[in-house]
UniProtKB/Swiss-Prot annotation:
Belongs to the ketol-acid reductoisomerase family. Mg(2+) 2 binds at D191, E227, E231. Mg(2+) 1 binds at D191, E195. One of its GO terms (biological process) is L-valine biosynthetic process. This is Ketol-acid reductoisomerase (NADP(+)). Its EC number is 1.1.1.86. GO terms for molecular function: ketol-acid reductoisomerase activity; magnesium ion binding; NADP binding.
């Protein structure tokens, strides 16, 4: 069973005289920074000149520096910028300011695990990865609660890296809920797998396949949209709150019987594909592909996104959502 840490397992004292630099001020960045400061810790923000987030961070009362200056001033440097830009920022801004007294921190293990960032051996490296979006991390903290997180140690040069990691987790409120010990390898590989085969790639492929099957069989696209996409939220919310068995408790017997008998057909086809995809992740094949795709300017990435934007399910959904005044109309672009 996993090792789980709570408030009583961590002490903020080890960070009391430290300066923590948060690189980035997006969803996670602002939540970490505000929570750490409210926990009594000294936080500064690192953002490039011209970043649209600089004024927001200043308005929230933080001292804002360039990433290099923040790295110079800080004892702990937390990377909360996109994975794809971290290696360049590390090489150009952070690495020149590193010494054995500093600690590198991450919220995702991709660049450490796949060696896009290779820190000096005398530097502590840890990960604290909340299992929820930044706005939830912040909201739960202000309510006196917390969002669960993962914690991992990559390098413990000082002998106190784990204490610092748990203190950081406590500072953002995660130990109120529970912090699960893992490794950079496990967090990275399971995170990529979940995104590709279940949460993002799996769900969107299942929606499109179901929608296309009904439309190709002569059913109205609008009806197919409701059955294969819109109603998914109802089921996911039940699973999220009560688990699979709890969801089944809340649906009709007809739906339940179809679930346990026909769902097995999907399982048998998909599981071997999932196993192959996991193997690609474990061997580093996906990482190499994605790194090269970025270096080439993302031609495949943009082409596939554009293809899916033109899918009929998107066109139908755009019109049907106009019939639903209860949906938020927030502009995502």
């Amino acid at each position: 069973m996993a090792k789980i840490y709570y408030d009583e397992d961590a002490s903020l004292d080890i960070l009391k005289d430290k300066v923590i630099a948060i690189l980035g001020y997006g969803s996670q960045g602002h939540a970490h920074a505000l929570n750490l400061r409210d926990s009594g810790l000294n936080v500064i923000i690192g953002l490039h000149e011209g970043s649209r987030s600089r004024e927001k961070a200043k308005a929230d009362g933080f001292e804002v520096y360039t990433p290099r200056e923040a790295a110079k001033r800080a004892d702990i440097i937390m990377f909360l910028i996109p994975d794809t830009v971290q290696p360049e920022v590390y090489k150009n801004e952070v690495e020149p300011e590193l010494n054995s007294s500093k600690t590198l921190a991450f919220a995702h293990g991709f660049n450490i695990h796949f060696r896009q960032i290779v820190p000096p051996k005398d530097v502590d490296v840890f990960m604290v990865a909340p299992k929820g979006p930044g706005h939830l991390v912040r909201w739960m903290y202000t309510e006196g609660k917390g969002v669960p997180a993962l914690v991992a140690i990559h390098q413990d040069a000082s002998g106190t890296c784990k204490d610092k990691a748990l203190a950081y987790a406590k500072g953002i409120g995660a130990t109120r809920a529970g912090v699960i010990e893992t490794t950079f390898k496990e967090e990275t590989e399971t995170d990529l797998f979940g995104e590709q085969m279940v949460l993002c790639g799996g769900v969107t492929a299942l929606i499109k396949a179901g929608f296309e099957t009904l439309v190709n069989a002569g059913y109205q696209p609008e009806v197919a949209y409701f059955e294969c996409l819109h109603e998914l939220k109802l089921i996911v919310d039940l699973i999220y709150e009560h688990g699979i068995s709890g969801m089944r408790y809340s649906i009709s017997d007809t739906a339940k019987y179809g679930d346990v008998t026909r769902g097995e057909r999907i399982y048998k086809v998909v599981k071997p594909v999932m196993e192959k995809t996991l193997e690609e992740i474990q061997k580093g094949e996906f990482a190499r592909e994605w790194i090269l795709e970025n270096k080439a300017g993302r031609p495949v990435y943009y082409a596939l996104l554009e293809r899916d934007r033109e899918h009929l399910v998107e066109k139908v959904g755009e019109e049907l959502r106009k019939m639903m005044p209860w949906l938020g109309k927030k502009e995502l672009k």
